[in-house]
A protein has these predicted regions:
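Short beta-to-alpha linker loops that shape the active-site pocket of alpha/beta-hydrolase fold enzymes
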Residues: 105-109, 184, 272
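A domain-start/cap signature at the N-terminus of enzymes
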Residues: 2-4, 22-74, 155-179, 183-185, ...
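Flexible "cap/lid" loop of the alpha/beta hydrolase fold
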Residues: 184-200
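Acidic catalytic loop of the alpha/beta-hydrolase fold
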Residues: 208-211, 274-276
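Short beta-strand/loop motif that positions the catalytic acidic residue
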Residues: 202-204, 208
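C-terminal catalytic histidine-bearing segment of alpha/beta-hydrolase fold enzymes
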Residues: 203, 221-222, 234, 238-307
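N-terminal export and membrane-targeting signals
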Residues: 1-12
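Serine-hydrolase catalytic machinery in alpha/beta-hydrolase-like enzymes
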Residues: 44-153, 162, 166, 170, ...
Length: 307
């Protein structure tokens, strides 16, 4: 059933995309790719990087068929507050994608417990520049892997998704498309003026009590539809197509006619919790839809774009 649903969705997206097809761009490898990879294909290993005076880490997964003569797309996946790169790899299934997967680890922030967090939240570690860390990380990946610099995508959950929103604002020259899930979009003082229109696909459960779908004025959290509409306006989208129902609990909203062929999509899970759609293991509190698989749906969206 799920495969049939996804096939119908893909057909609908392909038909609508004819309205504003993005410009195809030739893939560009970051180097001649003759340097051996830092680990065996098909494995996930913890790697280290010194950035901003701190020793940082990230979980790196190479596809089983990784070869040093092909330029690979890269997906950056940012964990939620208190989680880890390893934990996110487990529930997200992102490592099943035909791409290099990178799961960075945040720095322990403020508040209760020793919980890792990302820049832009009220509990983030003071003075830590995670945007600079992301740039250092991309520089490291470009130097050590055979990757396509034009096909770098960013996703994340909760606090990690909020940080992905920041990257969309300030790193549009390095991040081709973003896919936040259950995003915690706190006020961060950043004037969001990306250098180019950014394709966005956003996922959120209407029953999320951690980051409410309708927003939370006391915490400065916007209503999720308003946040998505902000990106549609930023990307100068002209057309909002009809909403499409997938199964009994998923509704997809789409904006087309956007500048430079970009698109904006919002995937609302009816009664969905603070969870990763399609997860088979714990990803947060509340209902988890199995109607869609977030990793497949976001990949089918972001892979259509390159810088």
């Amino acid at each position: 059933m799920r495969s049939r649903v996804l096939a119908c969705l893909a057909a609908a997206v392909s038909a609508a995309a004819l309205l504003t097809a993005p410009t195809a761009t030739a893939a560009t490898a970051s180097r001649d790719c003759r340097v051996p990879a830092p680990q065996e294909p098909g494995t996930s290993q913890l790697q280290q990087l010194h950035s901003g005076g701190l020793d940082r880490t990230y979980q790196l997964h190479l596809p089983a068929n990784y070869k040093s003569k092909k330029d690979w797309p890269v997906v950056l996946a940012f964990h939620g507050r208190g989680n880890t790169g390893v934990g996110t790899e487990v529930f997200s299934k992102l490592s099943e994608l035909p791409a290099i997967l990178v799961y960075p680890n945040g720095v322990i922030g403020t508040g209760d417990g020793d919980r890792q967090a990302w820049q832009g939240a009220p509990y983030s570690a003071p003075g830590v520049d995670d945007v600079a860390f992301t740039n250092d990380l991309l520089d490291e990946l470009e130097a050590t892997l055979c990757m396509d610099e034009r096909r770098v995508y960013a996703t994340g959950k909760s606090n990690g998704a909020g940080f992905v929103g920041i990257l969309g604002c300030v790193e549009a020259d390095r991040i081709a498309a973003i896919a936040p899930i259950a995003g915690a979009f706190y006020p961060n003082g950043i004037d969001c003026k990306p250098s180019r229109p950014v394709p966005v696909i956003d996922f959120h459960g209407t029953g999320d009590v951690t980051i409410p779908y309708a927003g939370d004025a006391d915490r400065g959290l916007p209503a999720i539809p308003d946040w998505v509409q902000g990106w549609a306006k930023r990307d100068r989208c002209l057309i909002r197509l009809w909403d499409q129902k997938i199964g009994d609990d998923v509704t997809v909203s789409r904006w087309f006619g956007c500048a430079r062929g970009t698109e904006v999509q919002h995937v609302a899970v009816t009664d969905g919790g603070h969870t990763w759609p399609g997860a088979d293991s714990y990803s947060g509190g509340g209902y988890v839809t199995q109607t869609i698989e977030a990793h497949e749906m976001l990949w089918n969206f972001v892979r259509r774009w390159s810088l």
